[in-house]
Design a protein with these regions (language model features):
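Short hydrophobic/aromatic patch on the recognition helix
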Residues: 65, 206-207, 211, 255-256, ...
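Solvent-exposed, amphipathic alpha-helical segments
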Residues: 49, 120-135, 175-186, 230, ...
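Double-stranded beta-helix
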Residues: 95-114
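Ligand-binding loop in jelly-roll beta-barrel domains
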Residues: 73-97
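Short, Lys/Arg-enriched, Trp-marked, Pro/Gly-tolerant hinge/linker segments that flank
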Residues: 108-119, 134-146, 152-200, 213-225
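Terminal helix-turn-helix DNA-binding modules in bacterial transcription factors
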Residues: 181, 190, 194, 212-257, ...
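Generic protein-terminus/edge-of-domain signal
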Residues: 1-63, 74, 82, 109, ...
């Protein structure tokens, strides 16, 4: 008689679909990355030195061992700090799993063992990308599998670690947060610099100066990127272009098309087709 076994189905809370970039680089003391927004996850980890980073309205002062998550469609940038030439580990990846929601807006401080482990995962991801670029499909399939599984295991382990609380290090960072929060609340309509300055109790010149301290975009350009992030969300939920255009306060679908292409580089149809 065959013995009966009970099969316990496993659930994949985290599934890495693809690795997009993997960087291990020492940046110069005057390094300044102007910022970007994309529809996939990114992890920035300081291996040595210090760096400043923004993530939407939040400003972070990152030290050795700090690991910061950037969620999809989050505007973020990074630059050298405290006169150091920071060594940065960066991995960007696409994940199809509800478990990644846990890491939204999270900051961790890695001990030496975890920092070394993340550096090894970064190296594995870089090796996979190199094999892909060389056209070595056989070895790439194995190496990419190892890199993805390694990153998944690291994230599962990280979930058991205590996160590092966010805190604002300067008055200007708090004002920047206030400005961005106002722009996010106004994502369904147009705004002006004058209106935003009044709402934040600032002069127009002070508003622009403080905003430029933490973001390479102008106030209105940044507001448009917020609207496009909302547009991506609404279109992904199945709303039509005309419905999204109206909900976000655009005067016409034609203007919405222009704004969307300016922000993403492609039309709404091509964006979701890709």
């Amino acid at each position: 008689m065959l013995q009966k076994f009970e099969f316990h189905k496993t659930e994949r809370k985290i599934f890495i679909k693809s690795v997009i970039t993997a960087i291990d680089a020492v940046r110069p003391k005057d390094f300044y990355f102007p910022g970007e927004m994309h529809n996939f996850w990114e992890i920035v980890c300081v291996a040595e030195g210090a760096a400043m980073a923004t993530a939407d309205e939040r400003v972070y002062n990152l030290k050795k061992g700090n690991l910061l998550f950037h969620k999809p469609m989050e505007f973020h940038r990074v630059w050298s700090a405290e006169g150091t030439a920071p060594r940065l580990f960066i991995i960007s990846f696409e994940a199809e799993s509800d478990g990644m929601a846990y890491f939204r807006d999270r900051l961790f401080t890695l001990n030496d063992l975890l920092l070394e482990e993340f550096g090894g995962i970064n190296a594995a991801c870089r090796r996979a990308i190199e094999l892909f670029d060389k056209g070595d499909t056989s070895e790439y399939s194995w190496q990419s599998n190892a890199a993805a599984v390694g990153l998944e295991a690291f994230l599962l382990r990280l979930r058991g670690e205590k996160e590092t609380a966010y805190r604002e290090d300067s008055r200007y960072a708090a004002i920047y947060r206030q400005i961005v929060s106002y722009l996010e609340d106004a994502c369904c309509r147009s705004v002006t610099v004058e209106e935003t300055a009044r709402a934040c109790n600032l002069s127009c010149s002070s508003l622009k100066r403080i905003f430029r301290m933490f973001c390479d975009k102008g106030v209105i350009e940044y507001h448009n990127s917020i609207r496009m992030r909302m547009a991506v969300k609404l279109l992904g939920e199945g709303k039509s272009i005309s419905e999204v255009s109206e909900q976000l306060g655009f005067s016409s679908t034609s203007y919405f098309h222009i704004a969307f292409k300016r922000a993403t580089g492609v039309s709404p149809g091509k964006y979701f087709g890709a």
